[in-house]
Curated annotation (Swiss-Prot):
It is found in: Golgi apparatus membrane. This is Protein DOP1. The modification Phosphoserine is found at residue 244. The gene is DOP1. The lineage of its organism: Eukaryota, Fungi, Dikarya, Ascomycota, Saccharomycotina. GO terms for cellular component: cytoplasm; cytosol; endosome; endosome membrane; Golgi membrane; mitochondrion; trans-Golgi network.
Amino acid sequence: MSLPLKPLTIDSNNKQLDSKQKKFRANVERALERFDSVTEWADYIASLGTLLKALQSWSPKFQNVRYYVPSPYQVSRRLTSSLSPALPAGVHQKTLEVYTYIFEHIGLETLATECNIWIPGILPLMTYASMSVRSHLIELYDNYILLLPQTTLRLLIRPLISSLLPGIDDESNDFLPLTLKLIETLQENLDDDSLFWQTLFLVMTANKGRRLGGLTWLTRKFPSLNAVPHLVNKIKMEAEENPSETETNDSHLDRKKRKEEAFKVLLPAAKDLVTPEPGLLIRCLVGCLEDENDILIKRSVLDLLLQRLRLDSPVLNVLITSEDKKLLIMSCCRTTLSKDMSLNRRIWNWLLGPTAGGMLNNNGGNSMEYTTSVKSANEESNVYFTKYGLSALLEGLSDLLSEEESVLTAFRISMAVMDRWEIGSLVIPELFIPLLYSSEKFKQNEQIMKTARTFFDNTETNIIWGKLFQELEDIKNLKILDFVLTNFNIGNDEEIIVRHLPLILLTLLALPSNDKDFDNIYKLQKFSLYNKLLNYIPERALLPLSHSKLKHDDEVSCEELLAKIRGFYTNVSNPSSILEKENIAERLPPFTTEDLTFLIADLIQKKLLSSLWDLENINESSKLFIAIFEKIPESEELKGRSHISWSDKKITQSIFEAIPRLCESNNDAKSEEIVGIVEIFGNYLYSRMEFIESMKLLKVVMMAVWKSLKDPRHQILGVKNLKTLNRFIPSKFIESALVYTFVEEEDISERLSVLDLLWTQLDSDSNLIRRPLELILGELFDDQNPFYLTVSKWILSILNSGSASRLFYILTDNILKVNRLEKERLDERDDLDMLTYEFQMLAYVLKTNNGRTRKVFSTELTSIKSSTIWKNEDVSTYKSLLLVTLMRFLNIKSNTHAKSIRSALILLDILLDGTEQNFKDIVIFLLQMSSKYIAEEGIEPELIAVSLLDIVSKVLRLSHDNGIKLDIFDDNAAHLKYIDFLVTSVSNMKSPLIVTAYVKLLSESIVYFENSIFRMILPLSASLVQCVQRLFLLEKREGGYYQPIALLLGGLEELLEISHGYLVTEEREGYFSGSNLKGDFIQSVVSNVFSSDSSNEESKIQGERDVILQSFRQVISCCLDIWYWAHNISCKSNDDSSLDATNHNSYKFKFRSKKLLETLFLLEPLELLENLISIRSDNTTVTLVHVLDGNKPAITIPHLLYGVIIRYNRTASVKFSNRDGSRSSTTKLTKGEPSMLKRLSGESIIAFLFNYVDSVENSAMEEFYGDFLLFFREVATNYNLYSDVSLSILKLVALISGKVSKTQFGEQKRVRREISDVFFKYLPNAFINFTNLYRGHPDSFKDLEFVVWRVQYIVNDQIGGDKFNTTLATIVNQCLTPYIKPKSEKTIPGYVLELAAVVSHLGSKVKSWRLLIAELFQNDKKLSVIGSDQTWEKIIYEWSIYPENKSKILNDLLLEIGSKRSSVTPTLITFNLGSDSEVEYKCQNLLKISYLLMVSPNDAYLLHFSSLISCIFHYLVSKDIKLKGSCWILLRVLLLRFSESHFNDYWSMISYCLQTNLQEFYESLQIQSEVDPQTILQVCKTLDLLLLLNMEGFTSTNEWIFVIDTINCVYKTNSFVALVDEIAEFKDYEITKTDDLELPTTLKDGLPLLRGIHKIERHTQLRSFFQNLSYLHYEKVYGLGSVDLYGCGEDLKKDILS
């Protein structure tokens, strides 16, 4: 029910007045005018005295004429301003004197009707009134305000309570009894205890400044809300007497009845506190427990809870909702986080009930009785908490686990409740797993993980592992166990690792895995978990298997095992069990240690047997099996053997059966499973098996190892297996098994491949390789053997790899072992047949490879240690050592073994070459001896082909060496066939043998091509490249093609190197010297096939150059493919150990391709670099270039710079250091153009150059600085030619300047000056065509940003220096101004703004920039368009804080509006408003001020606050509608951008402006005059924001004027004067219209009700706002809602700019 409001127009009514009244009115108006000129507090007293005299100048003479106050709103406003906190007590005293006079004369009835005019000014005074003022104020309350009618008191109840509570917040206050008496009087006069209490709770919830006073009142007056015992007993007796009445099926009726019963057991006074809304009490208590409150407030609230609102109160368990109860309990628990013991003790006692508090105070008495009572009290407390608090606490904590922000709180509360065992023992078991899951979910948050670890360490271990066991058994979630083992402190807790982890391991092993869904997860995680658990379990947690009475053939049920473990953990971790029993630590585990050890080992063995049967996870199973047996202690008598209770037969049998199946499988994954079998056999079974059985099994295992040794994809795996066997089994047995597999293998290439692998992978002192080596070398004994050539080529590869010494050592060591050199006579113990064999073997080895082996043998230094047996003889090389050995052997007199002598002589013949020191003596001694051997061709096609190629090669070499002319072919058909053979034959080659021979032939042939090579190099190189690519594809699919690819790349390298040499010679000499040509058959072949005439020598040379470069391009592309592939694999292998073999291979490919690229780089650096850039210009290529130039940028950069110059200025004469002098002649081929000239842009080269320089270390800048400076000077001189790439060049300059500045070299004045000088020469022309070239190119502006950040390094000047500013000004004028012209209508792209934002950081002293932004800020249209952009906000803010602008901008805007600084308090300044354009201008300036404040931080313009708010008040009480709208916006900006404390002096004026504006609108509705909807919208939005922000100065004592501020807003049973609700009752707002605003139904999101509404057509569209504001604001306070300040700010910005 709304009350009528006194209209504002009463101030200027035109009713008939007599002369005395007119004089009375005039006196009052004159007195009011005096307030306009006050400057200090004394003026206020004088003005108030004048006002009092004016009010006393008339009194009614007749009883029917009542006293009145002229212009009551104006008088009230002046009185309110006189009660400002800034004024002294004397002014306040005088003001109260005036108030007293007015109240006394107008009477209570008039005061009640005009309460909205007179009461608001008095209400805030109690908060800051001095002692002298307070007594007068109390009298005013006592004599007038509190005597108002009940209807008035009901609408004033909240502001009155708010105004009186500050008077009782200090209990030492002298006026405390009087103020308490006032509140009692208020409650009594109100005659509505329910409304009183509900409003009190609302005040304490919304206004934190009133909470201390509120608690003072509650402590004295709050009735107990606990159940009264005798009333409870009475209800119980009634229920027992009438059992039928207690039963009902209707839940609603049942709930209603329960509430009625709850009220029956409470004190009568308690009902008023919880009706109609019990939730208000809870919110009041919760609000008082928030962190922001003083500790005294929290302590008082907790005392209230303990004494008058226990946890078992019917209010908490019946009358309020479960959500409210949860809210209260969680607030209490959050309070424990402050770790104040005085608070925590109260909270625990409240949660545990009255017995807990008594228990703490119980001292003395009989100890036995005391112990019993404590135990009883404990049990009672637990029952109490379980019944009344546990579920709410658990639910509240669970709610916290869903959001990352609140998980930390949940952990901390959980740790806090551990302090009270009675609570913790109930809460932690229930929450442990959910807390773990939440920490796993947010494990990236370091703070959460740190807290989770602390929580884990503090939790009782039985609870941890009991709950984890339950989770494993019920949900089979291995992930959470893995998370615990990985992230928490497990290893340092003795109880965990000894007692619990073995049980958890047994649980995991016993869990069934037949469920398909579970099985997939299980397979992924189980072995990892087994190993993690085993790593933690110490040896002392296990006992020898022999100690257990269990046997391997005992049937053990996994279900039984799990049931026993379940029973154990149920006992030790279940809360109910914990409470019932004592001595948890002493409870027995489900198994003895010895039985537990046996069960774990038994189940792991079953896992292994299962894996061997399925051929899956054998490696993991075996690793686990070995790990457990390494961990289990062994009895002394059973060292290395199994106890009789244990059997390994099943494992042995399973391995015998599994290996053949593994060997038959073609699955790569299965092939790797052999590792586990090898590990089991070597590390476990071998020592426990019978010898014969172990040898049988070793042979079978070696067959599987042999298979992996043969497979190129698993060779490294095979070697690893071999090494594993060698670690556990004597070498002689392994060697025997290995030789067996060698003999069984029929394919010589496979045997050789394995031998080569073992040669490279096994240690040089390994004996495993000797016997297989002898078997392979045995193939050399017969040169007609089809495998002879294969073995000899392998020996050649050994020589090439640099490991010949190892081969020679083995061969000579075998001879020395048999031949005892110190003997002069032979006896029957000497094995001459073996010696003969060793002699023959070495002889056949030395005969291989056309004497190459012999040559290396002759020069290779021996590694055999010196000994006395050698005396003074030379044994430094293997040749000299063997010569000494042979001579000694031949000198033995009694040797009748002709075969051994003959073998020695053959070997001697091979070694002798005439260079020996004792050559003559040897020849004389062996004069009668000779040796012969016969060489015949092979029989297989491959070997025939190789032989043919070798013959041709040999003929070519010999003819060249001896100058012999070969005229084998006479007709052109033969010539063509030869060339065609070279080009086409390579296309089908695969075998390394054939490729080796082909490359050798090619190498011999190149010598004869000479100048004709230019006509055949292209098809020849193309054919070679195609072959490499074909083999490379096979390599990627199958592997094993490294050798032929490497040989072909070597051939290509030689071909290109020699052909390029001919080109260089030709370019130097201009022609070939014909007299030096060798007239051989290849020359004539090439000339006949590719003859061509050239009329012009120069064009001929250019054509030849093009051919060479085209070949280069093909080879570069091919090499890059190989290098990139190898590089990617080597990168991946760092993360994946399974790629070891592939990685080993990739390094070989990478090295070989790099070697060829290095050669090409030496020959044609620029050509190679440009091809690299065109193929792939990324960071990998930059890495490759660093590899090629050896991390010496001075080699690479000049070529790249030259590549740029030649594309833009071919006539340039720049001479870079390494292109013209310092390098060999091959690096300065500048006669011809690069082949990529038209296919690769200069922009691309500069982009690559930028990335390359960026990757170079700063210290390397000095190396190429001179070349870079030459380049920059060239660009600056011919700027017009380089205009297309000017920005890229500037970016490069910026990068280099930045890097140079960070070096010692860059500290030299010359260096810093040189770049700066060239830059300033270039700067005026660098951006001439910028807008044309780069319009719409975001990247170009990113590049400019890069440059701008580094300008200080380029110009060698500090930020703000003259050079720096000049550069920035140029960039602004030429690059930014065309886009940011204030008069331009086009939208400014985001990338331009990003650059502008960078300039704004650095350009505080750049005049053109400052003027540009100033002009834009002054342009109203442009600002409204750009202002909403966040980047623009940063720019405007940066501009506004420049030293020249910081205070000037706001001062200028205020000056233009016409404001001036306020005096002691806000006063009115007269503004003469002119034309509409002037008003519009002022509006725009007000909005600019608003925008400027919004883009600035809070309190940035604090010095201007007084002027700003004064300006606002002046216009808000004026008549200008448009200015009012802008001022309301500015007021909202101040509310968001300045701290609440700065408004303390101004709340009354803010309230007055809001009140008068809304009341004018209200009266306009009544008389149906015209209303400006936009102004009303802004007024409403301001009120909306004020209510949302809940600023105490406004809401506590002024809110009631505008909205219904009590629970009456819901029911509206009491009268009200709230303007918003008064307006809502107007008839225009009764009918719903289609254009009504759709407003939200809640304020939970923290945004105003009118968010997003910036313009309306009619005021009636606000119908929903007026009707719902009071209720929604009440709901927001009730819901303890927060405020979204950012969202409010964004909405306000749209108001400013719309």
